[in-house]
């Protein structure tokens, strides 16, 4: 029979390792002698691997691809047969891991095929993209159907893994993930061909489109997190061709030139009511900016305000002043902490006046500032902001009695109003006068610091003052730090960093004027490129300086839960990133390099055997190397003590060396590891707890070290508290845990991440009706009621944006948005007169900044998309925010309008309002009505305003100066990053490039296969063990190195 002769032929070719060119010539001869159908030939090829007894033979996909390009077998036939014989159908028993299934599989009866499947599918993708195969409409239809079957099979396998107690599902199998990605790319490539577009666009192929839509609907949710670029491409494909897996009778949507006509007609029919700027709108927005890490970006704020108020600058000024006083008043009523009160107060007194002054500095932009302030002050709550004379007759809290005066003097200091107006605006004689020297100027402060470095310490102590000078101080200190980084003046830089680290509230105020990225990027670059051989003299001062700078970076990172982009770090090779992600994990001795083993031994000897830490010990080990060894040092030392090889007093005495100022920052890493060790260990925790007690509450510590030690405890206290409470629950009779918890208690309020307190969460979640979402709706209603009388000087309703943030983080943005839409619908139906106010409040909540996505907002605002390189990637954010949820709902409006017309209309109106508020900045030419009897046409460039604020609007962390750090590794690092970034190209271009590479030479001369777990070659060379390889990396590999497709396999499998 022909099949027997072909089977023997294929087996001999595999046995003798016949290359592609010779296989093509031999197979052409055999076709003349023994003709065979493409399905039978494909089956024969796939069954031939059973005879080899190995899981992966790289020649088999080469032979299949060769036959496809010869036209002897068709792609849809190959995909169908491949799926039929694939081990993706295997169902592991509950509790069995994927590796064991592969290991125990019997090759001749049940061969593991995923690596072969991956390579064949990738070859198919490349041949389709090059136009070599799948040329007819019928082939395209059959290929689409085969791809849909593959997707459904992979999803079914993933679900079976979950059902078999494999919580990782597909994530537990690198090969399955790569197969999942390959099938998705194949679908994307086919859909991008001319014939593919014809099939997806034509009405007669509706059954095929339904089949593809059902597969896509199952594929996209899993793809979203694993392969975002591929998800975006397929998601666009689904929307473009309406591939939702339903027949047109259910969708009832008219498509014309790929435009949803019904959707456009419906949106056009939705009429907007008058735009209302509720008093609650800015109240919500400012609360959201300041509730956790200060999310203040001048460009974003100014753009939001202009979008909200357009040319009405007098209204803008009055409303933001009123809202800032309202936020401060609300904080007092809610008994917010003193540090929160200081931040709100500083925003009003230190931030707003220079912000207004910068606006006025733009030519021809004028507004009656004194009148705006007067109107605003007439609307604030007099019980919270009493006059000086009223303060003595008040029985309540008069802590904010001087805020009005502070604000007015700050405005006068910035030349917004004359000093003589203060008495009239206050309604009484002020209790102070303007300082003789006027407001601080940033450049003058920089000059003072350069002349006398001790001046920096004095200025830092003034950051928390409320005299209107904080912005100039922050600008000067930040730029001086940048200059010191460039000059490598680390001694002075150390003193500034120490001063800032021990003043966490000053850091809050700094973020009103500079982003974390702007402050920290030069510091992180300095630490990452710190060369040990550059430093001369004693090593202890270098450790001291390095540790102080690092401690400030860690203080920012842990206080505000910053991510790498916020720190200004782009490379995964960064020491800072490695320390944060890996520093608290200890290593086994056999995992250490020879250098690390030597350093570890010398540090153990210095701490526990010698009489102190010698110069030789430190000079042999750079600070970066030491910090990465701390966890292992603790693991080995504590293990020796627990094994009885080291006395506890010796252990304690050795660790006390780490309480010296030059080593103290390393306790951040040490305490983190120690807390994890205590929490994870099932052994008796006595020795680890005694060690922790000695480090948290040392019996003696120097005055200089005490401040650093407090900063270390601030950083680590929250995680230690959670771990110790869990250990106490497991060991309720232990009495040695409470003293540690008591020592940590004063530090627990260090973090500022907008997380709610337990005392807040309980009433929200127990709210009747509706729990947390019900409590949000109740708050929403109180905001509407308050906004119905915007000119009355009444107390604002109790509000904290923590409520919304908590709901987003726990319930998800989609459910929160649904609750807001429910309330909007209720207000529209029950009280149409407040519908406009309700819409503005909802839009303000949706538009409000969120820390998780704020970096993305900054990137979008400051990034020049017209001139940017494709390599510049927007930072990812790990949460689905309200804007994302609203966009998703807006896409469903056509279908929703058939079921719930009013809700669909509300979504359209809310979507329009949010887009108006968040519209990107542009050159604007507003018509300014100054209530002065004339209209003035002004070309107001927002960039000019930002420049007048003396703030950097670039968003990349560099001030208005060249931040060339003059460090040896900069050029190399930039080259590496550029090489990496150049791989991030447009998906369409990648496909074209990959096709061009394939067209060069597909003759393959492969080495022997093996029984390894890696994944083949070609575009299938996804990297041995590289699970998260992106589409761009995979395909660009072929583009940059066509020989990548022809690599010899020898040595790749072990």
Curated annotation (Swiss-Prot):
This is Mediator of RNA polymerase II transcription subunit 5. Component of the Mediator complex, a coactivator involved in the regulated transcription of nearly all RNA polymerase II-dependent genes. Mediator functions as a bridge to convey information from gene-specific regulatory proteins to the basal RNA polymerase II transcription machinery. Mediator is recruited to promoters by direct interactions with regulatory proteins and serves as a scaffold for the assembly of a functional preinitiation complex with RNA polymerase II and the general transcription factors. GO terms for cellular component: mediator complex. InterPro entries: Mediator_Med5_fun. The keyword Cell membrane does not apply. The lineage of its organism: Eukaryota, Fungi, Dikarya, Ascomycota, Pezizomycotina. GO terms for biological process: regulation of transcription by RNA polymerase II. Keywords: Activator, Nucleus, Transcription, Transcription regulation. It comes from the Eukaryota. Belongs to the Mediator complex subunit 5 family. One of its GO terms (molecular function) is transcription coregulator activity. Its main location: nucleus. Component of the Mediator complex. It is found in: Nucleus. Signal peptide: none annotated.
């Amino acid at each position: 029979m022909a099949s027997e002769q072909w089977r023997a032929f294929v087996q001999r070719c595999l046995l003798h390792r016949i290359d592609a060119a010779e296989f093509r010539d031999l197979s052409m001869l055999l076709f003349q002698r023994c003709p065979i159908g493409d399905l039978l030939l494909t089956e024969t090829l796939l069954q031939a691997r059973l005879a080899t007894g190995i899981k992966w033979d790289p020649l088999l996909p080469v032979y299949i691809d060769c036959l496809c390009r010869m036209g002897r077998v068709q792609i849809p036939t190959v995909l169908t047969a491949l799926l039929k014989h694939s081990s993706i159908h295997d169902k592991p028993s509950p509790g069995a891991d994927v590796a064991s299934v592969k290991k125990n599989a019997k090759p001749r009866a049940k061969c593991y095929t995923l690596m072969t499947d991956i390579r064949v599918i990738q070859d198919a993708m490349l041949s389709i993209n090059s136009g070599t195969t799948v040329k007819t409409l019928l082939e395209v239809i059959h290929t689409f159907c085969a791809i849909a079957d593959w997707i459904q099979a992979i999803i079914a396998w993933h679900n079976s893994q979950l059902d078999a107690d494999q919580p990782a599902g597909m994530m537990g199998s690198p090969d399955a993930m790569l197969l999942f990605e390959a099938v998705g790319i194949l679908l994307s490539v086919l859909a991008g061909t001319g014939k593919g577009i014809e099939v997806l666009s034509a009405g007669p192929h509706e059954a095929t489109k339904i089949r593809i839509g059902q597969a896509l609907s199952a594929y996209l949710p899993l793809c979203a997190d694993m392969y975002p670029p591929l998800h975006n491409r397929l998601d666009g494909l689904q929307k473009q061709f309406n591939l939702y897996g339903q027949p047109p009778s259910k969708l009832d949507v008219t498509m014309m030139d790929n435009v949803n006509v019904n959707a456009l007609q419906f949106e056009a029919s939705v009429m907007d009511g008058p735009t209302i700027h509720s008093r609650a709108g800015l109240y919500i927005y400012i609360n959201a900016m300041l509730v956790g890490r200060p999310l203040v970006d001048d460009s974003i704020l100014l753009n939001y305000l202009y979008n909200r108020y357009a040319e009405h600058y007098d209204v803008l000024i009055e409303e933001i002043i009123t809202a800032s006083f309202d936020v401060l008043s609300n904080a007092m009523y809610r008994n917010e902490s003193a540090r929160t009160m200081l931040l709100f107060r500083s925003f009003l007194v230190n931030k707003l006046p220079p912000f207004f002054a910068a606006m006025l500095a733009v030519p021809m932009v004028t507004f009656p500032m004194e009148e705006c302030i007067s109107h605003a002050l007439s609307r604030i709550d007099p019980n919270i902001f009493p006059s000086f004379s009223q303060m003595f007759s008040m029985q309540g809290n008069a802590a904010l009695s001087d805020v009005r005066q502070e604000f007015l003097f700050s405005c006068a200091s910035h030349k917004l109003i004359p000093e003589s107006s203060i008495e009239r605006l206050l309604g009484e004689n002020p209790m102070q006068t303007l300082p003789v020297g006027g407001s601080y100027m940033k450049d003058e402060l920089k000059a003072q610091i350069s002349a006398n470095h001790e001046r920096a310490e004095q200025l830092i102590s003034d950051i928390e003052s409320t005299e209107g000078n904080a912005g100039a101080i922050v600008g000067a200190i930040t730029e001086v730090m940048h200059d010191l980084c460039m000059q490598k003046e680390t001694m002075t830089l150390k003193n500034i960093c120490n001063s800032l680290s021990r003043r966490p509230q000053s850091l809050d105020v700094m973020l009103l004027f500079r982003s974390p990225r702007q402050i920290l990027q030069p510091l992180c670059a300095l630490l990452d490129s710190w060369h040990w051989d550059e430093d001369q003299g004693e090593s202890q001062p270098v450790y001291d300086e390095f540790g102080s700078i690092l401690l400030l970076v860690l203080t920012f990172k842990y206080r505000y839960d910053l991510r790498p982009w916020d720190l200004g770090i782009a490379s995964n090779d960064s020491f800072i990133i490695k320390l944060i992600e890996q520093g608290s994990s200890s290593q086994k001795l056999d995992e250490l390099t020879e250098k690390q083993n030597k350093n570890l031994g010398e540090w153990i000897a210095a701490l526990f055997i010698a009489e102190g830490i010698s110069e030789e010990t430190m000079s042999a080990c750079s600070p970066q190397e030491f910090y990465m060894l701390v966890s292992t040092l603790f693991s080995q030392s504590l293990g020796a003590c627990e094994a009885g090889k080291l006395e506890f007093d010796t252990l304690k005495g050795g660790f006390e060396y780490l309480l010296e100022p030059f080593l103290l920052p390393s306790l951040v890493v040490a305490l983190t590891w120690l807390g994890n060790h205590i929490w994870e260990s099932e052994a008796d925790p006595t020795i680890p707890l005694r060690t922790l007690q000695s480090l948290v509450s040392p019996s003696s510590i120097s005055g200089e070290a005490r401040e650093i030690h407090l900063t270390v405890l601030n950083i680590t206290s929250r995680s230690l508290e959670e771990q110790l409470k869990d250990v106490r629950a497991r060991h309720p009779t232990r009495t040695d845990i409470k003293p540690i918890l008591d020592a940590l208690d004063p530090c627990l309020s260090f973090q500022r991440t907008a997380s709610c307190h337990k005392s807040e969460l309980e009433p929200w979640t127990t709210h009747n009706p509706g729990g947390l979402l019900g409590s949000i709706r109740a708050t929403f209603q109180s905001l509407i009621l308050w906004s119905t009388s915007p000119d009355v000087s009444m107390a604002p309703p109790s509000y904290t944006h923590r409520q919304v943030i908590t709901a987003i983080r726990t319930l998800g943005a989609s459910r929160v948005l649904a609750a807001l839409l429910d309330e909007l619908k209720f207000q529209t139906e029950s009280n149409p007169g407040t519908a406009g106010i309700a819409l503005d409040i909802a839009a303000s909540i949706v538009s409000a900044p969120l820390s998780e996505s704020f970096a993305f907002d900054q990137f979008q605002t400051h990034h020049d998309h017209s001139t940017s390189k494709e390599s510049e990637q927007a930072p990812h954010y790990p949460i689905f925010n309200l804007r994302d949820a609203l966009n998703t709902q807006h896409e469903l409006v056509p279908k929703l309008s058939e079921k719930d017309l009013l809700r669909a209309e509300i979504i359209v109106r809310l979507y329009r309002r949010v887009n108006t508020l968040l519209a990107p900045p542009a050159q604007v030419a507003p018509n300014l009505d100054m209530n002065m009897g004339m209209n003035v046409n002004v070309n107001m460039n927002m960039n000019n305003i930002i420049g007048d604020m003396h703030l950097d609007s670039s968003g990349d962390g560099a001030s208005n100066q060249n931040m060339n750090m003059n460090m040896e590794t900069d050029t190399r690092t930039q080259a590496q990053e550029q090489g990496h970034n150049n791989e991030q190209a447009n998906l369409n271009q990648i496909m074209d490039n990959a096709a061009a590479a394939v067209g060069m030479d597909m003759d393959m001369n492969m080495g022997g296969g093996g029984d390894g777990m890696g994944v083949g070659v070609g575009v299938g060379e996804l990297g041995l063990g590289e699970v998260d390889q992106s589409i761009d990396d995979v395909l660009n590999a072929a583009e940059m190195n066509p020989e990548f497709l022809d690599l010899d396999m020898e040595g790749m499998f072990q």
